Amino acid sequence: MASQGTKRSYEQMETGGERQNATEIRASVGRMVGGIGRFYIQMCTELKLSDYEGRLIQNSITIERMVLSAFDERRNKYLEEHPSAGKDPKKTGGPIYRRRDGKWMRELILYDKEEIRRIWRQANNGEDATAGLTHLMIWHSNLNDATYQRTRALVRTGMDPRMCSLMQGSTLPRRSGAAGAAVKGVGTMVMELIRMIKRGINDRNFWRGENGRRTRIAYERMCNILKGKFQTAAQRAMMDQVRESRNPGNAEIEDLIFLARSALILRGSVAHKSCLPACVYGLSVASGYDFEREGYSLVGIDPFRLLQNSQVFSLIRPNENPAHKSQLVWMACHSAAFEDLRVSSFIRGARVVPRGQLSTRGVQIASNENMETMDSSTLELRSRYWAIRTRSGGNTNQQRASAGQISVQPTFSVQRNLPFERATIMAAFTGNTEGRTSDMRTEIIRMMENARPEDVSFQGRGVFELSDEKATNPIVPSFDMNNEGSYFFGDNAEEYNN
């Protein structure tokens, strides 16, 4: 991409740093995950969790949610100003699962947010360590992406449920910063913008006054983030039109939906990072590993190696398949919910099946579920190979616009063809090419029509043996060319509800 010089790497976004060299980036990312690990160990001590209980992913998620809630200033302020019955704005908590007499018990815990903040800062050399908090948010977002479908949210904003592969990061909180913006898919950004425009249509004062000025700045910033994800001049020019609109309304919504559809073939660049549950970092820190000294990267071999020798457990409901639960968490750990299943299966070294065939529900257990029948099992999070995470979207032809698939946003930089149903996609583009964006629309449609499903993306890129940490010998897999690999095929997952 032409603007490479001004872009910060993900790790810089992740750690809020200015431009750093590779060693400094590795050290600051290492400091970030090390802090998460130290915090987790301290929380396990506070809660008197056994080693086994501390490795339970459900306990990890509760602890992660507590610290995110403790630092959610906006919500904390809101809760103090709007006291609701039975909710203490100064406390946070959740379910902690303990092993008692061969059974799992649920215990609801409550902590002062102030106390949680103190423990977090203490684990992070006295700093607020926002980067670590964002990292946890992205892990939760990746888990949601693998677990839930967003059909309802898509339909509500007038988008097509088949555009689900554009929805990465759709459950990330607003406060997730630059690192959060980097991992949001095109559809997620479009949805946020459409919601904003709809509010403006329904509420006359939305764009007015002092508040309206701030709203406008946020609107233009979101437009610029989305523009930066597109890789063709015509798509970017259309984003300029949307951004500069005096009074955003239905025309802009139309343009945005058009752009979202076009991203199914002319894919945007969306970052992928392997963000692991806090307990995984905790295990490593506890075993004496010094993340800051050794350095760490979210997009290289490090997360694979970490998962290779961490044992994490999960609660399993009576009719769930532990192997399927493992697949769900593996996909979340590598941000691979929207990756081609052929590629994921090859890297994992075990068949990764579409979500419609999974016998498992989400990882979190609802408060009304019966604990009597709960069992636990080891999550199999190891992989056969490792591969570099991408942020390019996998367009061929010098990484410009070309073939995509109606259901993939590549995670791994691995050579493959991107099969897609051109007929399905192009059917959505009949008719409307008039209006002020007509020439751009025509240009975008032309590029899409010229895209060939047999083109190879990530030419020459391969996977690596886990012993090959310097990535010297790429193994380029060969895939069955016509077998399209969408995770969301025949989907029957639950909807995401906050």
Curated annotation (Swiss-Prot):
Motif (Unconventional nuclear localization signal): 1-18
Motif segment (Bipartite nuclear localization signal): 198-216
First and last residue of the signal peptide: none
UniProt region (Disordered), positions on chain: 1-21
Superkingdom of origin organism: Viruses
GO molecular function: RNA binding; structural molecule activity
Primary localisation category: virion
InterPro entries: Flu_NP
PTM text: Late in virus-infected cells, may be cleaved from a 56-kDa protein to a 53-kDa protein by a cellular caspase. This cleavage might be a marker for the onset of apoptosis in infected cells or have a specific function in virus host interaction.
Pfam families membership: Flu_NP (PF00506)
Keywords (A to Z) from UniProt: Capsid protein, Helical capsid protein, Host nucleus, Host-virus interaction, Ribonucleoprotein, RNA-binding, Viral nucleoprotein, Viral penetration into host nucleus, Virion, Virus entry into host cell
Assembly, per entry: Homomultimerizes to form the nucleocapsid. May bind host exportin-1/XPO1. Binds to viral genomic RNA. Protein-RNA contacts are mediated by a combination of electrostatic interactions between positively charged residues and the phosphate backbone and planar interactions between aromatic side chains and bases.
Note from the entry: SC35 was derived from A/Seal/Massachussetts/1/80 (H7N7) by serial passages in chicken embryo cells, thereby acquiring a multibasic cleavage site in its hemagglutinin (HA) and becoming 100% lethal for chickens. SC35 was then passaged 11 times in mouse lung, yielding the mouse-adapted variant SC35M.
Stated name of the protein: Nucleoprotein
